[in-house]
Structure formats: structure tokens, C-alpha cells
């Protein structure tokens, strides 16, 4: 399948995950799910554990790296179990300092292979809200001036349409950037345009969306964003 081929084509690319551990992540992710309510923090854990296998297929040589917004420590991940241990005793609290965490990654100041390394880097940002240390205009300027070898996907961990729309409006159109909604919302949007979206393909979009425009355009009408060759089915 095309998705597998695309993932294999970026094998060896370094991947880092910036995970939101701010206090707002303690809110219920889906208020309509009264049978099995989960917080955004719990959903982030589950998503990252599921993503781990796919990320390790791509960044297989030295694992991928995870950093939390309110903890400067970088964690090197080599297995799904490593991800699980990250959350032992860890609570979501604090603010949303996206600017402070993203600036070194976007500028090349910090890279898994060393300062100012020129190899490609995929940055996955899992967050639920507005940055607390930079405005959306400031975020747009910062992301817009990133190194061309850095690709960014924002994975939205919120049901708040206003927040998702703010990210879409300010950064989604920047080159090398994608906004990926939660699976249920993204699936609904993709299917509204006559396409299908499995959970596996949604995870692939999260990894590939910033680098490969056809994944960024999955939730647009057929023919948008470059024609039929960009349609993922």
C-alpha cells in the first residue's frame, strides 16, 4: 500500500514528540462519551503508545525522542514499554510553553544528532490549547522561519473547534506544516469528501503530513491541493 511505501521512504529520519502536560489536559476529552469518559491526558497517553510502533519503524536506528512541555528532559524511546513508563506518576499540570519548547527544534539549535545537524527532522506536537508564552501570530512567525529540513505536525488533543480553527488559520498553510485533528473528527472530515480513513492511516498522516502534501490534503475535496496524484485512498 502507498502508506507503507511512504513510511519506508523516510526510514531513518529523526522524529521528536513534544507532548502537552499542561493542566487543561485533565479535562474530559469527549463529554458525550458518558459510558467511558477519558481525559485528554489519558487519550494522549493511549495515542502515543499506539504511535510508538509506527514511529520506531521510521526512526528505528536510535529510537525517537519525547519531551513534555513542562519538563525539559528529553526521553529516548526504543519500545512501546518505554512510552508507558514515561507516564508512571506523571501528572498534567502547568502551562503551555510551546514557544520555549519549539524554538530550539525549529531553528536547529537542538537536534537528536547534535547541534545544527542538517539531516531532516519530523516534529510531532501533541497539544490541546493556545500557547501560553507566545501569541498565535508569534507562533506563525516562529514556525514560518523554521529550517527547511524540519517538518511539523500539530496533533490536536481537544474537541474545542475554536482552538483547532486557530491553529488551522495561523500555521496550517505554512510549508512543511500540517494540523491533524483527533481521529474521530478527522475521519468525519475525510469521509465528507468521499474518502476513507482508517486509524492506521490517521497515524500515518500525523507522521507524514508535514513532509508529504498529499497527507496534509487528505481532508480536502478531491482534486484540491494538487490533483488526483495527491489523493490518499
Segments and roles (model prediction):
Residues 5-9, 54-58, 106-118, 141-144:
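Surface-exposed acidic, glycine-flexible loop patches that form ligand/cofactor-binding
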Residues 13, 219-233:
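Cysteine-dense, membrane-associated helical/juxtamembrane modules
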Residues 74-120, 131-134, 157-165:
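Von Willebrand factor
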Residues 81-87, 160-210:
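Von Willebrand factor A/integrin I-like adhesion domains
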Residues 12-14, 28-33, 78-82, 135-139, ...:
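Short coil/turn segments at secondary-structure boundaries
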